[in-house]
Amino acid sequence: MQLNITGNNVEITEALREFVTAKFAKLEQYFDRINQVYVVLKVEKVTHTSDATLHVNGGEIHASAEGQDMYAAIDGLIDKLARQLTKHKDKLKQH
């Protein structure tokens, strides 16, 4: 899995990069054929937003989440992506 992290109005520190990498590594337990991941972290006034696009076998998955801090936004994003990956895996098994 290739992971690309970009920040808009936020500096991507080493701690933040490690946190994102660890969280996205856990997504492989839901679907093991994740090819590329694009993560965009944004800060707009008081809103912290995280967006991600996953290129997986059989399609593309996108999710976005907001939080009071960047770590909460990333946690919300991972929860949404885990649900979507589970649904995607079930769809592929049905065919």
From Swiss-Prot:
One GO biological process term: dormancy process
Annotated knockout phenotype: Non-essential gene, no formation of inactive 100S ribosomes. Double hpf-yfiA deletion mutants form 90S ribosomes. A quadruple yfiA-hpf-rmf-sra knockout strain is significantly outcompeted by wild-type after 4 days growth. No change in sensitivity to aminoglycoside antiobiotic gentamicin in stationary phase cultures.
Keyword Phosphoprotein: no
Keyword Cell membrane annotated: no
Similarity comment text for this entry: Belongs to the HPF/YfiA ribosome-associated protein family. Short HPF subfamily.
Primary role: During stationary phase, promotes and stabilizes dimerization of 70S ribosomes by the ribosome modulation factor (RMF), leading to the formation of inactive 100S ribosomes. Converts immature 90S particles formed by RMF into 100S ribosomes. Crystallization with T.thermophilus 70S ribosomes shows it binds in the channel between the head and body of the 30S subunit, where mRNA, tRNAs, initiation factors IF1 and IF3 and elongation factor G would bind; however RMF is still able to bind.
Oligomeric and partner information: Associates exclusively with 100S ribosomes, which are dimers of 70S ribosomes.
Protein name in UniProt: Ribosome hibernation promoting factor
